[in-house]
Amino acid sequence: MPQKPLKVTKKAKDPRRVTKKQKNLRKAAPLQLKSKKKSLQHLKKLKKSSSLTETTERLVASKVGHLELLRGTRKELEKGKKNSK
């Protein structure tokens, strides 16, 4: 008669238990890499949202004509007029 491997059922782990990550939260946190050069440390503080805001405003202004925002710079408007002629 052939023998099968035993079926081992694991006990369900208690959901209230504390894991290693919960004990030491500093290890689980993402790494904050700091540049060693003093001249580059200010770059970490910069937010890159200004160009995104500008492009969004420009897009909205070009789609809606009655806004007080410009549709672009003067040079861009002149190029558009030349291309349309």
From Swiss-Prot:
Compartment(s): Nucleus
Keyword Nucleus appears in the UniProt entry: yes
Extract the coiled-coil ranges from the record.
none
Q: Name one Pfam family in it.
A: DUF2462
Q: Which UniProt keywords apply?
A: Nucleus
**Nucleus listed as a keyword:** yes
Gene Ontology CC, one term: nucleus
Q: What is its main location?
A: nucleus
Region annotation Disordered: where it falls in the sequence: 1-28, 35-54
User: Where are stretches of biased composition, namely Basic residues?
Assistant: 35-48
Additional notes on this entry: Present with 6650 molecules/cell in log phase SD medium.
Name listed for the protein in its UniProt record: Uncharacterized protein YLR363W-A
Q: Which organism is it from?
A: Saccharomyces cerevisiae (strain ATCC 204508 / S288c) (Baker's yeast)
Task: State the taxonomy lineage.
Answer: Eukaryota, Fungi, Dikarya, Ascomycota, Saccharomycotina
